[in-house]
């Protein structure tokens, strides 16, 4: 299963190239390395214990990126819309996790702003992506932010809208009033009918999670004002997408499918930010949920925003001549953890030394205060990263060096009391480690972090060297021995028995002359023919 899923995801970048090549002229694109698939999955799994409001979600403004100025030559209107939607789905498959979309009412249907793309076609594209990635191996969170044009709140007619929604049953949502058909509330009906309730995390779901103590604050404590972890969102609730309205055109209540704009913090334009340089500043920023910045970015600036704890919404204007730059921009933002080209377990092996390139180190560069993750030999001896059990954003580096296998094992840990062997789970936590090293004037260094693929190659897990891969069943040698021993003993016993029977004659055959004499004696008592 893991191999099949990997093969599908490795085609993402090639598909992206083919989709654009079909739609645009003078286009060239090289596919990304397979390590990108492993890197994004490992990064998602590391963040699984973080609450969803603290995740770095890289997004795009659909109107500015795909609609404005995009004219596909030799295509009619319908073909152009179809190509744009294919590009959008490919971008989602490449790792984009947030979409900002303008919605307006035009020609008696709801459409994506400044386009002829029907809003339900946009939603069906999102649904296709959700269906295609709805496995534990590929699933991830998606945020869709809607801007409903203010002049679009009172259009339409019941008959027109009923035809447009393809038979949507309003009785499925109790708070809809049929007399209101044609206003902005219709958008919620479209979302319900085209996405499906099972994928959507709604305000009602949040209330339920808070009532059941499934939500946490930034300290990891149960909170009625918190959000669920990514793990709970994806694997317990089995949800995939949140919808939020950035305008105020729709009525809001806890039975709605959409969150209102008060749940998030969205800045636009050239916003000057400064990265937190202390634990108190990191804590203060963490108290702001869903931190988005919508702007035109460069490769360097978009990565800077992510490293400082923000989620960028890319609003660069593209056309058919420069749209290929978008992938480079998204790649710069998506991967806040790994070095480019990592993780790689294909290091050259030396038969004279013990080598196992399945463990990850935190590589710090002092001259620019940057860091990334890199796969190293598990037998190398390094210091390790230790996180305080109670204090937020509090990290230290161990005094002792050891191999990865022995750094934190059943025999004990090299981390001091009150600290656990750990790994940065978000960009802000990574920034906290960088600040710790910077304030101590640390030189370039490499330290072990709690991430490895020892059990299954390229399945990156936390929890020390004995952690197992959640996507593939792995049997240890000890369990395998316990399972195979009874069967082996039984088989050996049967083999011995069969061998003995083949080698030893039956007792009655030991004296063949006596056997023949007995047969002759019995034959005398037999009559020939029929007795008179």
Curated annotation (Swiss-Prot):
Cytoplasmic side: 509-532
Full protein name: Maintenance of telomere capping protein 6
GO biological process, one term: cellular response to hydrostatic pressure
Side Extracellular, residues: 24-487
Species lineage: Eukaryota, Fungi, Dikarya, Ascomycota, Saccharomycotina
Ranges annotated as spanning the membrane: 488-508
One Pfam family recorded for the sequence: TIM-barrel_MTC6
Signal peptide: 1-23
Topology within the bilayer: Single-pass type I membrane protein
Matches recorded under PANTHER family: MAINTENANCE OF TELOMERE CAPPING PROTEIN 6, MAINTENANCE OF TELOMOERE CAPPING
Keywords, alphabetical: Glycoprotein, Membrane, Signal, Transmembrane, Transmembrane helix
Superkingdom of the organism of origin: Eukaryota
UniProt function note: May be involved in telomere capping.
UniProt-listed InterPro entries: Telomere_Capping_Maintenance
One Gene Ontology term, aspect cellular component: endoplasmic reticulum membrane
Glycosylation positions in this chain: 26, 114, 151, 163, 169, 211, 253, 260, 322, 328, 368, 441, 479
Gene expressing this chain: MTC6
Subcellular location: Membrane
Similarity comment text for this entry: Belongs to the MTC6 family.
Location (main, coarse): membrane
